[in-house]
């Protein structure tokens, strides 16, 4: 520091020296006021320049190889996904890259492996051996606790049972009978379908025929060689409708029988001897042709 000591008994030369010394102190103070950047800013700028001019990650020197067969080394999930999500032009600083654990990344390791249950099921279905630990892959069977059973055994048993069912189903004969089957001798238990034309067939003396081509009175079921296919109604009638149809058919049969007994030309005498006892009508008094049996006085 400069000290300004003013003395009253000083000469002119002393005052001049005092002015020079005070001027030199002022120059030194100006030099001390020069500001400098701290060391942190320079280092950050240097790192930024290195990142800009550094080649991408793909052309960087190969990473150190690690034994792939060692099952205890697993890359943390966060570091793997960080490496995948970063852009190819991005590169880690030298200080950060030295602290992070580095593992070789392959295409197969980026895809998450399937669960143990699913992998074993696919391998059993396709008859493929279990995948062996190869280069770039980690395969380790997770053994269940002692108080639990492994799910692989149950899956294999289930698949064996399914294969047995499929094999027996192939050997089983066709369950349905076709039209070209051999005749079977013995009482049949086929259900007959009652149709509206059944009563009409009975009145005409025709026995109803079942679907298999056999009559209901014959206990031996023999397929008829000339079976005519019938057109069945589209809708099966209900109980009340069926009774009404039966009643209509019955009335129709009665009317047909009554008409068959009555002569068509009622005005022609039938020639029965019972008609001789009847009284003579007034129209017969004027004359009639008894020889031919036709009434000539008939007025239409």
From Swiss-Prot:
Organism: Arabidopsis thaliana
The UniProt record lists the keyword Repressor: yes
Bias (Basic and acidic residues) ranges: 43-54
Known partners and oligomeric status: Homodimer and heterodimer with SPL and SPEARs. Interacts with SPL, SPEAR1, SPEAR3 and SPEAR4.
Designated gene of the protein: SPEAR2
Role, per record: Adapter-like transcriptional repressor recruiting TPL/TPR corepressors to inhibit TCP transcription factors. May be involved in leaf development.
Protein name, entry field: Protein SPEAR2
Annotated Basic residues bias: 25-38
Tissue distribution: Expressed in leaves.
Biased composition, class Polar residues, residue ranges: 1-11
Transmembrane helix recorded as keyword: no
GO biological-process terms attached to the record: leaf development; negative regulation of DNA-templated transcription
Note from the entry: Knock down expression of SPEAR2/TIE4 and SPEAR4/TIE3 by RNAi in a SPEAR3/TIE1 null mutant produces lines displaying epinastic leaves.
